Amino acid sequence: MTRKILVTSALPYANGSIHLGHMVEHIQTDVWVRFQKLRGHECYYCCADDTHGTPVMLAAQKQGIAPEDMIAKVRKEHLADFTGFFIGYDNYYSTHSTENKQFSQDIYRALKANGKIESRVIEQLFDPEKQMFLPDRFVKGECPKCHAQDQYGDNCEVCGTTYSPTELINPYSAVSGAKPELRESEHFFFKLGECADFLKAWTSGNNPHDGKPHLQPEALNKMKEWLGEGEETTLSDWDISRDAPYFGFEIPDAPGKYFYVWLDAPVGYMASFKNLCDRIGIDFDEYFKADSQTEMYHFIGKDILYFHALFWPAMLHFSGHRAPTGVYAHGFLTVDGQKMSKSRGTFITAKSYLEQGLNPEWMRYYIAAKLNGKIEDTDLNLQDFISRVNSDLVGKYVNIAARASGFIAKRFEGRPKDVSGSALLAKLAAESDTIAEQYENREYARALRDIMALADIVNEYVDANKPWELAKQEGQDERLHEVCSELINAFTMLTAYLAPVLPQTAANAARFLNLDAITWKNTRETLGEHAINKYEHLMQRVEQKQVDDLIEANKQSIQTASAPVEEGKYEKVAEQAGFDDFMKIDMRVAKVLNCEAVEGSTKLLKFDLDFGFEKRIIFSGIAASYPNPAELNGRMVIAVANFAPRKMAKFGVSEGMILSAATADGKLKLLDVDAGAQPGDKVG
């Protein structure tokens, strides 16, 4: 049965470049969409630039151009980057569109008519220097729940909590740095708390198409935490309005009031699809009416789960539309075990990757080989990237065609033999359903492992039958024809399995194989005596220099203040730090559960620490000062809790930094904590 499916990726914001972190999500989505299309389903992939809000307005002002001109330029750049990585959108649109304005206003009116909108006079933070009300993302401060520093005014990127900017501790304006003032303003609220019963049912429910949950298990657990237990709910009503000046859509019958960007951004999915429907004649209502029998899936990052699993389904349902079939979240991208860094050159933009001449399918394959259906971070290990691409794609896959095609062309007029009874091909075809299920469930890593295991079987067959030797032997033409025909058919099957991940290679292979296109049917069907064309090289190896040049091209000089050592006993005091700099550091008391020496290191000690709210492992280079590390067990220490995780060579990942004092003789001493302090207590 042919399925009707609408798929989206989260909308990239229109004030920055596309980087490999964005690409993780769009590759994940594109692979899934291409798989559905290969299976013959009616599947549409829509996305758009997220264009509204104060950041865009201020960025355009800084450039001296109109916001409309800036977002048009950025959209063109974004689309070029995604197209360069073979992301096959059916439509890539903009949230600043007539369709999006209409849908946003219609949904607002429907929610209002349904009693889900109310106006309130609120106290809002106002920047006295810039004379403007501050949007949530332009207020920063300390999270009121987990006390992480330097968090935005609408949600915490550490614990995921959403809140009002007035709830921030020690807030400051991200525009001017000034301490904001509270002033009154009328705002409009979506009464999300009244939607709790629906959301509890939807988040814990299954979709009717295949019985699978709407959310991943990790996401559902988070929703239960946010929704509360029983009849109680912790959901807060959602402020959906912002004051002028603001770049966005004005709220109907409310001059000077604009829709908050997070209201019209997901509506952009509808707008992009509607634009596509109008162009090619699709029935839009069939996909968005309340009783729709079609499927709709959103692929997103874990940091925007709250918006997509709570606000968005509630907005849709209570405005008379269908809710999503599934919301699939993924983790963040790290590079070599660490957060992407501009100074290290690992904050890699899509444009630089393409401009350096690297094959985008190398990255598509590597990212897909790391992805599964869970909400887990993905690490791009650059050495592993080189070795895996060269081993799997060049060594195992494309070489199969290269080793057989020449004999077919020269000895058999480019026409393979009918080998439909081949045991080798039967083995490959037998995995079609299993690999299809893995793609369907977004278990790409498992799918690609199984595909490469099949490639290993084919290469073992090559080594066992040695076509290059058969070609030299008298009377072995028929056997040579049979072996090479099996290899060409095996290559075709492997290409079909890999086509969702390697669309350009599959298209090039289709030309070589003299096929209109590769489809999923090619995982089971043989070519028969179908004539093929002359083989053309399909993929080059990754060279170390290419990766080195890529990293160098992405390095940005970041000036850091260094404190030169003054002659004598003490180091010179470092350059003055402002209050805001200090507030970025989140220091906590932690209890040492276990401390031990690190095998293979003369400097490191491994600390198992209890922070109260969670347990972590931190490595510290103080082994010389504590020859008996077990004596530290049970001790309280002070640690930087929001220090970016660091990969410590072969020893593991360090999840923070323990504070110590450097004595005049060069030894490091842990800082003492007074009696009564508990794990998790803030220091400052």
Swiss-Prot record:
Intervals of motif 'HIGH' region: 12-22
Q: Biological process GO terms, please?
A: methionyl-tRNA aminoacylation
- Which Gene3D superfamilies does the protein's record reference? HUPs, Isoleucyl-tRNA Synthetase, Domain 1, Methionyl-tRNA synthetase, Zn-domain, Nucleic acid-binding proteins
- Cellular component terms, GO, for this chain's entry? cytosol
Q: Where in the cell is it found?
A: Cytoplasm
CDD domains linked to this entry: Anticodon_Ia_Met, MetRS_core, tRNA_bind_EcMetRS_like
Entry keyword set:
Aminoacyl-tRNA synthetase, ATP-binding, Cytoplasm, Ligase, Metal-binding, Nucleotide-binding, Protein biosynthesis, RNA-binding, tRNA-binding, Zinc
**EC number(s) on file:** 6.1.1.10
The residues the record assigns to binding ATP are 342
**Catalytic reactions of this protein:** tRNA(Met) + L-methionine + ATP = L-methionyl-tRNA(Met) + AMP + diphosphate
Cofactor binding mode, per the note? Binds 1 zinc ion per subunit.
InterPro entries listed in its UniProt record: aa-tRNA-synth_I_CS, Anticodon_Met, Met-tRNA-synth_bsu_C, Met-tRNA_ligase_1, Met-tRNA_synth, Methionyl/Leucyl_tRNA_Synth, MetRS_core, MetRS_Zn
Subunit text: Homodimer.
Known function: Is required not only for elongation of protein synthesis but also for the initiation of all mRNA translation through initiator tRNA(fMet) aminoacylation.
Protein name according to UniProt: Methionine--tRNA ligase
Taxonomic lineage is: Bacteria, Pseudomonadati, Pseudomonadota, Betaproteobacteria, Neisseriales
- State which gene encodes it: metG
